[in-house]
């Protein structure tokens, strides 16, 4: 089996689970994954605020009956998703939220946008 990058494994997993649309903000933590969404048949729908991405994933789920997926940047980006994810939780919508984390060697050192997730 050929070796994959973490981004390739992430995109392959999303495609294997039938994900066709992902809502989120394009950012440095996901740049390499963004390049391989389209070849995998995944459409990235950009938003201007992570809260909108979470609400859009919830709405997508409610209308389509499939899982909604949103991406938030680490730290403050993911905290912006809380309201939309709470709405999805109470509506019993199958929404998946994905966020990066500070690299293992940098955890606890106050890295860029590090937050206790």
What residue ranges belong to the model's regions?
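N-terminal alpha/beta PP-like core and its mobile active-site loop of ThDP/TPP-dependent enzymes
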Residues: 1-117
């Amino acid at each position: 089996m050929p070796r994959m990058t973490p981004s390739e494994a992430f995109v392959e997993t999303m495609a294997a689970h039938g994900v066709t649309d992902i809502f989120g903000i394009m950012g440095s933590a996901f740049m390499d994954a963004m390049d391989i969404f389209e070849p995998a048949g995944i459409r990235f729908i950009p938003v201007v605020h992570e809260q909108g991405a979470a609400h859009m994933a919830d709405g997508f789920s409610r209308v389509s009956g499939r899982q909604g997926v949103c991406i938030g940047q680490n730290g403050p980006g993911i905290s912006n998703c809380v309201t939309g994810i709470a709405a999805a939780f109470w509506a019993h919508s199958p929404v998946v939220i994905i966020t990066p984390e500070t690299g293992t060697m940098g955890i606890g050192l106050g890295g860029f946008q590090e937050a206790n997730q």
